[in-house]
Amino acid sequence: MHYADAPYRHDLADGSAEWSCHWITADDGTKLRVCNWTQATPRGTVFVFQGRTEYIEKYGRIAQMLVQCGWNVLAIDWRGQGYSERPEHDPMQGYVEHFAQYQKDIDALIDYAKSIDLPKPWNMVGHSMGGCIGLRALHRRGNEFDHATFSAPMWGIEFG
């Protein structure tokens, strides 16, 4: 399957590992940006699930380190973040109607990873909000991931 190329801001990213960025579409039509870093003989793939207001380039250095350790890396800009599609009413605002919409992003990401034959084992690293999204993905599609690691995960929000 062919995917349209998506932008990558070298000036914002630390790390020079070989990468490619593409546009994918969630089943509700939301356009999402994904990037993957690859190397010749991968041990598997690490999925990076970033936190709120973060963007793919922020993880360039981590991606480079993981590639140097033998892993391919796949990252996504969640809907409303980075270059992924934002709500029409305020394109500068990251917004979802329901937190469960992020699972549509996960579904599209997994479909993409399978379509480009990213090698297993598949490992997830979830930071902050990405940890919450990742934990829910494990409940829904846990058989897709072999391992998960969480960094300062957002397990919930306390009000008041």
Positions of PLM-derived features:
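Alpha/beta-hydrolase active-site loop
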Residues: 94-114
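Alpha/beta-hydrolase fold nucleophile elbow
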Residues: 117-128
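Alpha/beta-hydrolase-fold enzymes
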Residues: 129-160
